[in-house]
Amino acid sequence: MSIYLDEKNPEKHKPFDDASPDIVAYVRYLEVIAGKSPNTAFSYYCDLRNFSRFMKRRRGLVTDDTEIKDIDPKGLDTAFWGSVTKEDVYEYLYFLNSECGNKKSSTARRLASLHGFYDYLVNQVDLLKENPTASIKPPKQDKVLPKYLTAEQSMDLLESTQTQSDFPERDYCMVVLFLNCGMRLSELVGMDLGDIDMEQRQIRLFGKGHKERMVYLNDACMEALQIYLNKRNTMEGLNPKERAVFITRRRKERISNRRVEQLVTGAMKAAGLRGFSTHKLRHTAATLMYQTCLLYTSDAA
């Protein structure tokens, strides 16, 4: 659960060894063999640490009044994982719902973490013969329509980045790329100068699992990038070896995921938009592209 570790900075917690040996080995397998991103591997790591704590309390290895967050997740061997039953897993799902207040989607994700862990123990490294999660289905999800900005709200957001920001060229450019290219946050933050091909009007992005894809740049993106890069490349004190496309104003180094989220959230609030997140811009891009083929330009903002 996110209250135990900072899930925004998975690299900070490497080598992810504050767990039982089987969990540590599994997380390494996810990154090295399965090709999962650090964020994905870290999510599984956090989920399995939490399950370890729960099982220690359920088996009486700590006193009943011990807070889950205070239980050491280490010290569980392969034999212990082999002793886990389907009933234990059902009780864990009930715990997530009743004590932790998890949404169905969060509970389903944590169950998926257990599915993956036991599949690894049974089918990848042959340490166990039975998978107690094999027949357990995730909670039925409520159907919720994706939330996205309307065309008018998107224009308001773009205008906000130009009037409320201390680095308007950068913030406007980031939002234009979000809205037109449907980038993930990690893809935008991870962009290097060498990934941009202005002549071919495309950007190389690295998504989940380090998968590479090329994204076309329309006129709006080209204009926003040119204006921002002209500003970026003439900033006093900028290290000429800095590869990151989007940098901070003060330290002139790669901007972080969290900082982008803060900037976008601030621009949304200034535009009177509530209940939206950076990820919703990805939904907005796909929806508006389908509905109107709308292009966002500086003239419209």
Regions found by a protein language model. Name each.
Residues 1-299:
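Conserved catalytic core of the tyrosine transesterase superfamily
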